[in-house]
Each structure stands twice: as structure tokens, then as C-alpha cells.
A protein has these predicted regions:
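N-terminal leader/targeting and assembly helices and adjacent pre-domain segments
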Residues: 1-199, 293-308
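Acidic, glycine-rich two-metal-ion catalytic cores of nucleic acid-processing enzymes
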Residues: 200, 204-306
Length: 308
């Protein structure tokens, strides 16, 4: 069967659902992959705990050095010595973390998260097609190369994003210690600031998990819908208190996959446009989803059988 013959067969199988209309919107709303987000948060949190463990092993020695240099007669020389000691200690933390990372199997865990996101997205897509078009999809079609490039890029990028966390965190902690020394802060004050920085790192890791799962889900949704001949979608927000004003305003509106809307935010002076154009899930930590709009003239899905 040629591609054209297959498309004609699909159109014949689903035309009853269109009831004479050219386009129909999905009868179901795809669910955001919350289970994948939770799993990715577990991965990032586990990595941050490794970082904390390595840091806590070196921190007592750093604080001992801090205490000794505070008693030095020459603050300038003491500052230089402390800077060198802190730098070496944090380099050691980074090396130990790299060794522990091999046992943590970060690459494998991130790949599992990507696969879980794909499975969730595919199940939602199958549900949408069944509810709206009355057909079952051919599962094998979505295996192999269909998602492979997007998944591989996402995995590689996120492994690097996670691995970059210690560089930023350890750099911030080094600054906290050295600035504290120059300002004459107590050991207790320094430790509190370090704990605060760790909390910020943990929150940022959780934000990374939410943002990147949404990004991957958005990429997969776009692949599925455009492959099925859907050139348009309806924006659907998560409809809770965390939804941004911009996304709440976009909710329910129709957009083209080749023309994403521009993002904005409100200020006291009025609306400010960011210059960023995003589909659902592409804005930072966006949990919105794209509801497909099917067109009888272009619809083409890997049909398994027509529902009786």
C-alpha cells in the first residue's frame, strides 16, 4: 500500500467521526506526564544528595582552616592561604562526586526517564486518537527511529545540565566562604549560608526536572501531531493557581504548529512581551499541553483497525 493509499484508507475509516465537518478538535485532553516529572525529580534529588554528602565530608576541614586563618596576624596572607585551601578542597569534592557518579548510573537513569516520558506521551496520544477518531494505532510505528533523535538529544543535554550543577554550586560556596572571611563572619553564619545555597541548588534541580520533562513532552507531542497531519492545536493550561497569566489567556485558543504565540508577562506599567515564541510545554517549567485539531483532508495516522 502506498502512502497515498494508506492516507485514503485512514480518511475513509475516520470520516464518520467528522460528521461532514472539515476539522474536529480532540474529544480528550492529553495529560501532562506527572509520573515522569516525579521520577526525574528523584533522579536530580539523588544527585544533589550525592553532592551534599561529598561536600559534608570536606566542610569540617574547610571550617577548621577558616578558624585558623581568622587568628592569623596578616589578614591578607590568611585570605590567600584560605582561598587556596578552599579551592583545593572543592576540587576534591568535584572529583569524589565524579567517582560516585559512576555508581549512581546517571546516564542510565536519565534514559529511563526519557523512555517513561515517551511511553506516557504515546499512551495519551493513543487515547486521544481512540476517543476522537475511533481507531486503534499501530504500536510498532512509534518504536525505533520515530522518537530516537529527539530522545537522544534530550538525554545528552540533560546529562550535561545535571553534571553542571556542582560547578555552579561549588563556585557559589567558595564565594560564600571567602566573602565571609573578608567580612569577618562567624563559622555559624557561613554554615547557614552554605545550607541556604544547598537549598537553592535543590530547588533549581527540581525546577530543571519540571522544565525538561515539559520540554520533552512538547517535542514528542509536536512530532506525533504533525506526523498525523495536524497543523493546528488548541492550547490547554493546567488550570490551577500556578498557571501564568499569559498561559491562562492562551488557554482554549487555536494556534498553528508553524506559528507559536509570543510569551508575555504583566507589570505595573502594562504588558511586556518577551520576544520568545513557544508552543505548550516549551516555556520555562510550563505544564500546558497541545490538544490536536484533526483535518479530514490531511489526517494520516498509523491505523491498526477501525473500532466497531
Amino acid at each position: 500500500m502506498t502512502n497515498q493509499q494508506h492516507q485514503l484508507a485512514v480518511q475513509e475509516a475516520v470520516k464518520g467521526k467528522f460528521k461532514g465537518k472539515k476539522v474536529i478538535k480532540s474529544r480528550s485532553v492529553p495529560h501532562y506526564p506527572e509520573s515522569a516529572e516525579r521520577e526525574f525529580k528523584r533522579v536530580t534529588n539523588g544527585y544533589i544528595r550525592l553532592l551534599k554528602k561529598c561536600l559534608m565530608e570536606e566542610l569540617p576541614g574547610i571550617m577548621d582552616e577558616y578558624r585558623r586563618e581568622q587568628r592569623s596576624d596578616s589578614r591578607f596572607d590568611a585570605s590567600l592561604k584560605l582561598a587556596e585551601k578552599v579551592k583545593n578542597a572543592l576540587i576534591k569534592v568535584a572529583r569524589e562526586l565524579e567517582q560516585k557518579l559512576a555508581k549512581y548510573k546517571l546516564n542510565e537513569l536519565v534514559r529511563k526517564v526519557a523512555k517513561l516520558t515517551k511511553v506516557n506521551s504515546l499512551n495519551e496520544w493513543k487515547r486521544v486518537c481512540e476517543d476522537t477518531l475511533g481507531i486503534d494505532l499501530l504500536d510498532d510505528y512509534y518504536n525505533g527511529d520515530f522518537y530516537e533523535d529527539a530522545l537522544r538529544r534530550w538525554v545528552d543535554e540533560n546529562i550535561q545540565k545535571i553534571k553542571s550543577i556542582p560547578n555552579d554550586t561549588l563556585g557559589s560556596m567558595q564565594k560564600i566562604i571567602l566573602d565571609g572571611f573578608r567580612e569577618g563572619k562567624t563559622i555559624t553564619a557561613i554554615q547557614k549560608e552554605i545550607q541556604k545555597e544547598y537549598s537553592v541548588t535543590r530547588r533549581n534541580a527540581q525546577l530543571l526536572a519540571r522544565d525538561q520533562i515539559a520540554t520533552l513532552n512538547a517535542q514528542i507531542s509536536k512530532l506525533q501531531q504533525e506526523d498525523a497531519g495536524c497543523s493546528k492545536y488548541k492550547w490547554s493550561s493546567s488550570k490551577d493557581s500556578r498557571v501564568r497569566d499569559c498561559h491562562r489567556a492562551l488557554d482554549g485558543k487555536i494556534f498553528s504548529w508553524d506559528d507559536p504565540p509570543e510569551m508575555w508577562y504583566e507589570t505595573k506599567s502594562g504588558r511586556v512581551y518577551t520576544g520568545r515564541h513557544c508552543h505548550p510545554g516549551e516555556d520555562i517549567a510550563c505544564r500546558c499541553v497541545a490538544i490536536p485539531v484533526f483535518d479530514i483532508d490531511t489526517v494520516d495516522v498509523p491505523i491498526k483497525s477501525k473500532k466497531s
